[in-house]
A protein has these predicted regions:
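FAD-dependent oxidoreductase catalytic-site/capping-region signature
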Residues: 4-172
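Active-site-adjacent helix/loop segment of glycosyltransferases
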Residues: 1
């Protein structure tokens, strides 16, 4: 449709707005981020609904879980091995559980009445912590593009210092 009329889903950047929330009271800063989409479409272009829809993607701003990247072999042409290790820490799972429940509460507000249909994912039958954890384990992914970022700082987890000097390597 967009090729012919410059209208429809193709005219959108898909992520029309975002927002930040605290998954629980007492946090100094929001720990979760929303990406709101004015369409019900999957990354592969498929649609889980007939007609119009909207969705929210939830991301953790500062997860405790840590992954790793390491060499597959001595051949520099071999791609690296990557373990994202999402949701390895209980605190991260709890933040997503709380975030899902807050998202449901948000979309149950009367302002969404004219637009809201049935919950597609994870679906209204996913309610308990175990059910949410199972859904997360099957569907969680990053909204970002892993490409070689590294921690900056003076601590043991940092790769470079605040002046961008690589720890353990002189003059680089």
């Amino acid at each position: 449709r967009w090729l012919l009329t410059k209208t429809g889903l193709g005219a959108s950047n898909q992520f029309e707005s975002n927002g930040y929330i605290r998954s629980r009271a007492g946090l100094k800063w929001p720990d979760l981020q929303y990406h709101f989409l004015a369409g019900a479409i999957a990354y592969d272009g498929s649609s889980a609904v007939k007609g119009h829809g909207f969705q929210a993607h939830l991301g953790h701003n500062k997860p405790q879980s840590r992954g790793r990247v390491w060499l597959r072999s001595a051949d520099p042409a071999d791609p690296p091995r990557m373990l994202f290790n999402y949701l390895a820490e209980e605190a991260d799972k709890q933040a997503y559980r709380d975030g899902l429940r807050l998202t449901r509460e948000l979309f149950e507000q009367s302002a969404f009445d004219p637009y809201r249909g049935e919950e597609v994912s994870p679906g209204k039958d996913v309610q308990t912590d175990d059910e949410i954890d199972d859904w997360l384990a099957k569907t969680a992914e990053t909204a970002y593009h892993p490409c070689g970022t590294c921690r900056m700082g003076e601590d043991d987890m940092a790769v470079v210092d605040p002046e961008c000097r690589v720890h353990g390597v002189n003059h680089l």
